[in-house]
């Protein structure tokens, strides 16, 4: 009997851990190498004197995708993780002192919507939710659960109606503006694009699906912190399926055999070489192509030009007492809403007026802080680093300015004084720290951006995008399907299925039955007809462009039609008189 295939996974983040568990379940030997002495990547914890902070994600959204990640391992998530539902979604604070409580309880939303939007405000809110539901259902099934390995998968005619239903070519803010009359509600229902690290003015409207999942499925919190989910996946991978995790093992390079068009394993910074039949990279994709692989034109030209998401200054404050004015999730929005996003995403700097997010996990999970105290996280979105080094930015001064601005807003909008006196201890992540700690390219906390030309087939592939290495795969925020923990977990299925297919391993069906929907298998005849139709449409479009762009072939007084006509064999030419410019 042949020995099992060996796969090395670089990085023990959400994607790497879930992929390790999936592959190990299929009998593949899996070794995970992680640079840090902890797992989870950005889904890791900071602890200090009884205070616990989620270093990265704190909003447990799209719960079905989490359930599916555990079901694929023949497990139920409720047997491993205790989920706590937030009574309120957010408390949103505006610059004029007004605030609104967003809740998935419609009986509470109705008076809030009518107070700000007028008598028909609640009905327009329901219409917005109806459209967002379409985005959610279509977006998950088409964009998240499908792997666009070739352009042919993208151009299938069955997807054309979906592109319009999902408003791919419209933007989050402009769609919200069709339903909400007031600036306050437009802001309250578009700031969620920051979960994708994007401006609502540039983010494809399909990402309004985030608002739907918040209201329809609720916002949850895993007891013990977000890292609990990843830790449980690791436990399943190691204890149930025999995967191996090695910590404090940073990778120096991915070893390659260019003649054989394959990778052969990794070399650790310690000098140790670990051989493998395939490598899955869960390290930041842009970092990996620039630092772990030989240079190539695609990396230096194509990848280097792709847009990045924002970074953040994140404060982790241990508070002396509970602050009752704050809820679990709090949003403070700048009056100069659009201008602040322009400064983040166009100028790549900290905005002059801050919008920021405040999370108090201790409000929903008392184990996050000592009795009578709060653990408080403040996330301030700012532009990513302008270069690989932080030479252009003085983050010591930028952090100092951000702290001062946050405190001023908190005190003014909450009616408090000397808020800084409540802070017993502070830890900070700025863009340079995000880059150093997690190898995030230019400190971009959510990887590559998700504009129209950086999603689906246009996003870096789950299999080596350069075409050089047939056994090199990727999982994580910057590859398809995209960023966010639930989306990355869904992506782990696409990647692991691809690896199994590469080895000729058939994925066993889950022992856990689920009602989740899946697309029907591809019909090969339908696929061929899609290609034929695409070629015909492309030919028609090319001809139309010629007729519009080149109305006259001036040297011989010909039209574009007559010029093309002359290129045809004589038997196929149209009589010249029918194509003449003059009567």
Curated annotation (Swiss-Prot):
Keyword tRNA-binding: no
Cysteine disulfide partners in this protein: none
Catalytic activities: 15-cis-phytoene + 5 A = all-trans-3,4-didehydrolycopene + 5 AH2
Pathway given in the UniProt record: Carotenoid biosynthesis; lycopene biosynthesis
Stored PANTHER family: PHYTOENE DESATURASE
General function of this protein: Phytoene desaturase involved in the carotenoid biosynthesis pathway. Converts phytoene into 3,4-didehydrolycopene via the intermediary of phytofluene, zeta-carotene, neurosporene and lycopene, by introducing up to five double bonds into phytoene.
Name of the molecule in the record: Phytoene desaturase
Protein encoded by which gene: carB
């Amino acid at each position: 009997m042949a020995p099992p295939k060996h796969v090395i996974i670089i990085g023990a983040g959400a994607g790497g851990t879930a992929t390790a568990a999936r592959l190990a379940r299929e009998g593949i030997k899996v070794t995970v190498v992680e640079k840090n002495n902890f797992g989870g990547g950005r889904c890791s914890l900071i602890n200090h004197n009884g205070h616990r902070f989620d270093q990265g994600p704190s909003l447990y959204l799209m719960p079905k995708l989490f359930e599916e990640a555990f079901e694929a391992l023949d497990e139920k998530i409720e047997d491993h993780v205790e989920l706590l539902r937030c009574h309120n979604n957010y408390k949103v604070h505006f610059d004029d002192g007004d605030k609104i409580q967003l809740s998935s309880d419609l009986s509470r939303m109705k008076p809030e919507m009518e107070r700000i939007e007028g008598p028909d405000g609640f009905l327009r809110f329901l219409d917005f939710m109806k459209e967002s539901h379409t985005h959610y259902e279509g977006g998950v099934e088409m964009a998240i659960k499908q792997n666009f390995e070739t352009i042919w998968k993208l151009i299938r005619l069955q997807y054309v109606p979906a592109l319009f239903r999902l408003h791919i070519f419209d933007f989050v803010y402009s769609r919200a503006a069709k339903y909400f009359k007031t600036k306050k509600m437009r802001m309250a229902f578009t700031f969620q694009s920051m979960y994708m690290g994007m401006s609502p003015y540039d983010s494809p409207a399909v990402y309004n699906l985030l608002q739907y999942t918040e209201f329809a499925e609720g916002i949850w919190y895993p007891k013990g912190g977000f890292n609990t989910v990843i830790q449980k996946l690791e436990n399943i991978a190691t204890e149930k399926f025999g995967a191996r995790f090695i910590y404090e093992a940073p990778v120096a390079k991915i070893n390659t055999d260019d003649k054989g068009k394959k990778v052969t394993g990794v070399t650790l910074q310690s000098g140790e070489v670990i051989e493998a039949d395939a490598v899955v990279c869960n390290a930041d994709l842009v970092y990996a192509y620039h630092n772990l692989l030989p240079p190539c034109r695609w990396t230096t030209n194509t990848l280097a030009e792709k847009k990045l998401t924002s970074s953040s200054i994140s404060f982790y404050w241990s508070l002396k007492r509970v602050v009752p004015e704050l809820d679990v999730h709090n949003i403070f929005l700048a009056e100069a809403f659009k201008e602040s996003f322009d400064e983040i995403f166009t100028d790549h700097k900290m905005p002059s007026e801050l919008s920021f997010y405040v999370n108090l996990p201790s409000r929903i999970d008392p184990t996050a802080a000592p009795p009578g105290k709060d653990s408080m996280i403040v996330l301030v979105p700012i532009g990513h680093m302008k270069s690989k080094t932080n030479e252009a930015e003085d983050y010591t001064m930028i952090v100092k300015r951000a702290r001062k601005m946050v405190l001023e807003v908190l005190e003014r909008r909450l009616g408090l004084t000397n808020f800084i006196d409540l802070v017993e201890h502070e830890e900070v992540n700025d863009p340079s720290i995000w880059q150093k700690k997690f190898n995030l390219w230019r400190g971009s906390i959510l990887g590559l951006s998700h504009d129209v030309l950086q999603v689906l087939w246009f996003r870096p592939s789950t299999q080596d995008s350069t075409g050089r290495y047939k056994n090199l795969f990727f999982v994580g925020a910057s590859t398809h399907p995209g960023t966010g923990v639930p989306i990355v977990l869904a992506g782990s299925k696409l990647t692991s299925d691809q690896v199994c297919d590469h080895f000729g391993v058939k994925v066993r069906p889950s022992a856990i039955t689920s009602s989740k929907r899946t697309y029907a298998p591809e019909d090969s005849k339908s696929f061929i007809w899609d290609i034929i139709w695409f070629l015909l449409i492309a030919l028609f479009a090319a001809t139309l462009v010629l007729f519009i762009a080149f109305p006259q072939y001036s040297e011989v007084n010909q039209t574009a039609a007559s010029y093309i006509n002359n290129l045809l064999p004589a038997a196929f030419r149209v009589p010249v008189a029918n194509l003449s410019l003059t009567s």
